[in-house]
A protein has these predicted regions:
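Short, surface-exposed beta-strand/loop "edge" segments at domain boundaries and coil↔beta transitions
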Residues: 80-87, 112-117, 137-141, 178-183
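Internal, hydrophobic beta-strand segments that form the core of beta-sheet-rich folds
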Residues: 166-176
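Aromatic- and glycine-enriched beta-alpha-beta binding-site module
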Residues: 70-114
């Protein structure tokens, strides 16, 4: 990344949706009821079905001085079939930097854990791979003391795949170090999602459109 100084903000396109590159297909609200989750239990691995929604909200461009990021604010809500109470809730941002084609996915869950996965993809790619690893300064993982002791997260990998029919699927593998369990335990999640609500434009784009239709005298 080339820049004259670290303070001067680069110009940003208010139309975030047109600048999202490879993550653009994710914008909108999605539903999936084919989820399969394999997680650790005292008696060994347990596999259960789940139902979920992913809500990717188009947000305004973000400047770090000369760096410009375009992204989606997301919320994941997961329940077991036939239940209302969530057994997994997740929020974060999915960010794309057009200049470097880098993608950053942040994660925060109410179990007391945060992470940021990183990857690279080009506009039009049918697959996105992201990786986070404990101890890394950029794509790292940070957990509360209990999780560090009992379910140490070593790495988090997520793959998004975009299908011709407009759906997307994902696979996640979270590698854990658990006392009494030999080797690393692979906690896996996978589902296929279909859109239930189209994306809405970001506030800056709405404002830009209003100004164009009603220019100031």
């Amino acid at each position: 990344m080339k820049y004259k100084d670290i303070y001067t903000e680069a110009p940003a396109n208010p139309d975030t949706l047109s600048m999202l590159g490879p993550i653009a297909p994710l914008a909108g609200k999605w539903f999936g009821d084919d989820g399969v989750d394999t997680h650790p239990q005292a008696g060994g691995p347990e596999t259960e079905p789940y139902v979920e929604t992913w809500d990717f909200e188009v947000m305004d461009p973000q400047n770090n001085g000369p760096q410009v990021l375009y992204g989606l604010r997301y919320h994941v809500h997961i329940t077991k079939p036939g239940e209302l109470a969530a057994f997994h809730d997740q929020v974060g941002y999915l960010l794309y930097e057009p200049e470097t084609h880098k993608i950053y996915m942040t994660l925060a869950i109410p179990r007391g854990q945060i992470a940021m996965a990183e990857g690279t993809a080009m506009p039009g790619d049918r697959e996105i791979r992201l990786h986070a690893e404990r101890g890394q300064m950029v794509n790292g993982i940070c957990s509360n003391p209990f999780l560090e002791e009992a379910f140490l997260t070593k790495s988090w990998n997520v793959v998004f795949k975009f299908h011709e029919d407009g759906r997307f699927s994902y696979e996640q593998v979270t590698k854990l170090e658990i006392p009494g369990v030999k080797g690393e335990f692979e906690h896996t999640d996978a589902n296929t999602m279909r859109m239930i609500e189209a994306p809405r434009p970001n506030p800056a784009m709405i404002e830009e459109g209003l100004l164009n239709r009603c220019p100031k005298a």
